[in-house]
């Protein structure tokens, strides 16, 4: 869908999130920037374009952690991290949710390394691009989910060995 005024709509969304978290102390908040991974698997509308056009809105969010999907085609360049607030932790979507596609630890490491050109490793957590959508048309078996997460853990070990 197109919005008549995307800038205004995204500003409104940020204001709403900030109102939700306003006044709550001692809690870390996260926002997931969904690229509709399950919809891609089902062959539905794909969202293309990087995070650059919404960087100003992201930087206004009063949250601690952003999860950003980067396995999707058209997710944009990781150079966007040059412009992201330095106090954000980044949950880097680096494991595909696509059924039948199990990324190797090496593939995952290769997806993460470009982000580390811009982000201190202490700010990065690894995560799947999105949830594994149990019960949806993009259903991933529990055994496959386990294998995907095992490979994510192994990639994290390799990255810790390399980057500290």
Model-identified regions with their sequence ranges:
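Domain-level signal for soluble alpha/beta catalytic cores
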Residues: 1-164
């Amino acid at each position: 869908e197109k919005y008549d005024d995307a800038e205004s709509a995204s500003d409104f969304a940020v204001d709403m999130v900030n109102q939700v978290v306003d006044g709550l102390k001692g809690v870390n908040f996260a926002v997931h920037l969904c690229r509709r991974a399950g919809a891609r698997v089902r062959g539905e509308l794909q969202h293309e374009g990087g995070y650059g056009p919404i960087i100003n809105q992201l930087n206004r969010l009063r949250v601690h952690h952003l999860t950003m999907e980067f396995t999707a085609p058209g997710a944009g360049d990781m150079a966007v991290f040059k412009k992201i607030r330095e106090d954000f932790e980044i949950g880097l979507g680096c494991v595909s949710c696509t059924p039948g596609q199990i990324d190797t630890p090496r593939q995952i490491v290769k997806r993460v390394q470009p982000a580390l050109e811009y982000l201190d490793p202490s700010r990065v957590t690894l995560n799947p691009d999105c949830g594994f959508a149990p019960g949806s048309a993009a259903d991933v078996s529990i055994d496959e989910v386990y294998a995907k997460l095992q490979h994510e853990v192994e990639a994290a070990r390799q990255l810790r060995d390399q980057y500290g």
